[in-house]
Amino acid sequence: MAFQGTSRTLTQQSSAATSDELQKILFSPDAIKKMATECDLGRHHWMRADNAISVRPLVPEVTHGSIASFFKSGYDAGELRSKGYMSVPQVLCAVTRTVSTDAEGSLRIYLADLGDKELSPIDGQCVSLHNHDLPALVSFQPTYDCPMETIGNRKRCFAVVIERHGYIGYTGTTASVCSNWQARFSSKNNNYTHIAAGKTLVLPFNRLAEQTKPSAVARLLKSQLNNIESSQYVLSKAKINQNARSESEELNVESPSFAIGSSSASRSEAFRPQVVNGL
């Protein structure tokens, strides 16, 4: 039978002072800066030839040490039940290419545990993306909470690993990866349902159709068509008659008569206003 009870959060388990201390560790200006610079949280990471394999921990080393010390002191004092766990419900990566679609290359993205020397994908959650498949959204869901421990000189936590393959002749940036996640820390841990890594291919953005109104290109085409029409028909002393029963204005134009079957008559009858899609 599955457990159906309730569990207390870290804030409920600790005093307000220790809770504020943890908040300061996680959300201080220095901690936020390190999350950006060391982990690339919410930032675009460029995949280059000189950076073919990228390993980005989800927690900076300094922040990891501060959190581990916080939990250890609470554990040694008998205030907390464990030395702390890191929980990440989901990691979402937005991947876009920065080269043409005919470039031969691919990316291999997966979530790893820094406690594993081999850096193997967690539960086989690994996604391969060919260059012509991009853009795409990739998601990972760890099936366990990671202990906040140190193994040798390694700070154990989850990490996003990105491998670049191929792209012969392209030494610069071939793809951009923007990763987002929300790390949680608690004195309790759990196991979670295994979910395969998600891969959603996204249609490239059609910036010419982003507006509901006629675009600048459509307006230009319309103006060109109007210029063509005005160049073919020259109004000579047109008399404007206003009808009181109608809101429109009628133009009475005296145009020269054409012989039936002549080339001029055929051109006149064959001409029809052209319609541009979206106008």
UniProtKB/Swiss-Prot annotation:
Annotated GO CC locations: host cell plasmodesma
Return one Gene Ontology term, BP aspect: transport of virus in host, cell to cell
Where does the record place it?
Host cell junction, Host plasmodesma
Q: Which Pfam families match?
A: 3A (PF00803)
Keywords assigned: Host cell junction, Transport, Viral movement protein
What protein family is recorded? Belongs to the cucumovirus movement protein family.
Function in brief = Transports viral genome to neighboring plant cells directly through plasmosdesmata, without any budding. The movement protein allows efficient cell to cell propagation, by bypassing the host cell wall barrier. Acts by forming a tubular structure at the host plasmodesmata, enlarging it enough to allow free passage of virion capsids.
Can you say what this protein is called?
Movement protein
